[in-house]
Design a protein with these regions (language model features):
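Internal amphipathic alpha-helical repeat/solenoid segments
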Residues: 20-39, 72-77
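Contiguous hydrophobic segments
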Residues: 69-81, 171
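Short linear, low-complexity motifs centered on an aromatic residue
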Residues: 59-73
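Residue-level signal for alpha-helical context at structural boundaries
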Residues: 22, 66-68, 214
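An alpha-helical repeat/solenoid feature that recognizes helix-turn-helix modules
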Residues: 1-16, 36-62, 78-110, 114, ...
Length: 217
């Protein structure tokens, strides 16, 4: 899967044969479905594959003749599944600093822009306490830190982003367990810890030394 590809590629693992096999599987899948839209509704599938392909240096604009970026041009489709959609679309677009394709002139859909994705994420911030969640009024560590990863490139240039990110990360610090662990959906897990470390790293914060995220040392 794409997360395995991303993790290994970012680590620097070198296995051209394995990466080529992954790429060929993606090409085969895209050509079999005959579409650059990898799921009928969930465009996070496109975003995830774009991230994976970019990690191995492949071109997501030409995968067996299909441009996987094109479906992300429709903001209405991107946000259909909720906040996950724009979070991962923004991450995917920024992994390769990709230009967002233009919608056809006769399209009635909303054109995706980076500004539109950012604003959608900001608008979904939990009022008062800060952070983000799929639903409810309490910040979820996974969704919050994923949102922060998407917004991090704009932290120093957009005051609204900076303020929202700061509120979100404070909410995460407040939820951190006494042993330093993190949990989501009532379960302490390594994935929530990893997402938090990724978010902190994107902000230039050392999770191993920053007093806001080091507990009982």
């Amino acid at each position: 899967g794409e997360w395995a590809v991303l993790g290994l590629a970012r680590y620097g693992y070198e296995d051209p044969e394995w990466y080529t096999a992954y790429y060929n599987n993606v090409v085969k899948y895209v050509q079999n479905i005959g579409s650059n839209k990898l799921h009928s509704r969930k465009l996070t599938d496109n975003s995830r594959v774009i991230i994976g392909l970019t990690a191995i240096g492949a071109d997501p604009t030409n995968v067996g003749g299909y441009n996987l970026l094109e479906p992300l041009a429709n903001l209405d489709d991107v946000v259909w599944q909720g906040i996950n959609g724009p979070i991962y679309a923004l991450i995917a677009l920024d992994t390769g600093d990709y230009e967002i394709p233009e919608l056809p002139d006769d399209s009635t859909a909303t054109q995706t822009t980076r500004e539109g994705l950012i604003q959608y994420i900001l608008d979904k911030e939990i009022p008062g306490s800060g952070g983000w969640a799929l639903w409810g009024t309490k910040a979820d560590p996974d969704i919050t830190t994923m949102a922060v990863q998407a917004l991090a490139p704009y932290y120093n240039t957009n005051a609204d982003v900076k303020a929202a990110v700061n509120r979100g990360m404070k909410a995460i610090s407040d939820q951190q367990l006494s042993n330093g662990g993190m949990g989501s959906w009532g379960t302490v897990n390594s994935e929530s810890c990893a997402q938090t470390v990724c978010a902190l790293s994107d902000l230039g914060i050392d999770a191993d030394t920053d007093p806001q995220y080091v507990k009982n040392m």
